[in-house]
């Protein structure tokens, strides 16, 4: 894939992701309210948000974090993967931050917001079907885009 095509995809991804509604007023929301906004149990919400924080290396933009969360949510809905957030995140060979214990990090409002936005985007039904991401390159599926050092692939 050419550099110009990757840049075009990255710009398209960034523009599309930023079409979300106003930020959630996190200073006034409880963890229970945040989980409800995402349509998840508190346990699932905390787990996915912690993994998003760890996988993002605490440095990715909201766009990158949304795509990481969306990858997890999409896997739960895909027949080729386990049926729950916990099972997807604990699946052997996936999400190295879970396997090596690095997902035991403090969540941030930033990762919480990313999970909520990903869940909203998925619920709206017009989200990309990203199922894979890595920092090495496109190695499976169809290239979706490159955001914050990660390549995202659709199935």
Regions found by a protein language model. Give the residues of each.
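Cell-wall glycan-active module
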Residues: 1-39
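Bacterial extracytoplasmic/cell-wall-associated proteins, especially those involved in peptidoglycan
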Residues: 25-155
């Amino acid at each position: 894939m050419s550099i110009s095509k990757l840049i075009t995809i990255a710009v398209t991804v960034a523009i599309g992701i930023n079409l979300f509604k106003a930020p959630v007023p996190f200073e006034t929301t409880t963890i229970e309210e945040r989980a409800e906004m995402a349509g998840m149990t508190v346990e699932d919400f905390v787990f996915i948000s912690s993994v998003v924080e760890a996988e993002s290396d605490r440095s990715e933009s909201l766009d990158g974090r949304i795509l990481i969360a969306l990858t997890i949510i999409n896997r739960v809905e895909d027949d080729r993967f386990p049926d729950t957030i916990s099972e997807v995140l604990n699946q052997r060979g996936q999400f190295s931050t879970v396997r090596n214990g690095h997902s035991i990090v403090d969540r941030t409002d930033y990762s919480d917001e990313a999970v909520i936005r990903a869940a909203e985007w998925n619920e709206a039904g017009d989200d990309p079907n990203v199922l894979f991401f890595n920092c090495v390159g496109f190695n499976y599926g169809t290239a979706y885009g490159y955001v914050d050092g990660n390549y995202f692939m659709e199935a």
